[in-house]
A protein has these predicted regions:
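Short, Lys/Arg-enriched N-terminal segment that forms or immediately precedes the first helix
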Residues: 2-16
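Short helix-boundary/capping micro-motifs
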Residues: 34-41
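Residues within the DNA-recognition helix of helix-turn-helix
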Residues: 54
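Basic, amphipathic "hinge/linker" alpha-helix immediately C-terminal to the N-terminal HTH DNA-binding motif
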Residues: 69-92
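Alpha-helical linker/hinge and terminal dimerization helices associated
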Residues: 88-107
Length: 112
């Protein structure tokens, strides 16, 4: 038998609806980095329309917005990830790391 490896895909649901997964976390992190939905979408080779719909879907499921937009003004507009958004990123990454560690431990136990 060849080398065995475990893999997993984690997602978080809220009220039975898809809320957060790897791609959405990457989008939130890109928005946080660029301060722009358009730049974040381009960096992920995603359309602006899809990025905005994804944000709207997450915001509508969250208890408070994960992303907020500001318009115009002397400094120009922009987009930012809120504390709730950053907390959601941290939750996903923590749970994903724990799942990965669990699977690695199980694999080690299986191979010993």
């Amino acid at each position: 038998m060849g080398e065995i490896a475990f893999g997993n895909k984690l997602w978080i649901e809220k009220n039975g609806q898809f809320f957060l997964g790897k791609g959405r976390v990457e989008l939130l992190k890109a928005i946080d980095s660029f301060g722009s939905i358009n730049a974040a979408a381009k960096s992920m080779q995603m359309s602006y329309k899809k990025a905005w719909k994804t944000i709207d879907d997450m915001n509508s499921l969250a208890n408070e917005p994960l992303v907020i937009r500001t318009t115009g003004g002397s400094g120009g507009g922009g987009t930012s990830v809120t504390k709730a958004g950053k907390d959601a990123i941290s939750l996903y990454e923590r749970v994903n790391a724990n799942c990965h560690s669990f699977l690695e431990d199980e694999l080690k136990n299986e191979q010993s």
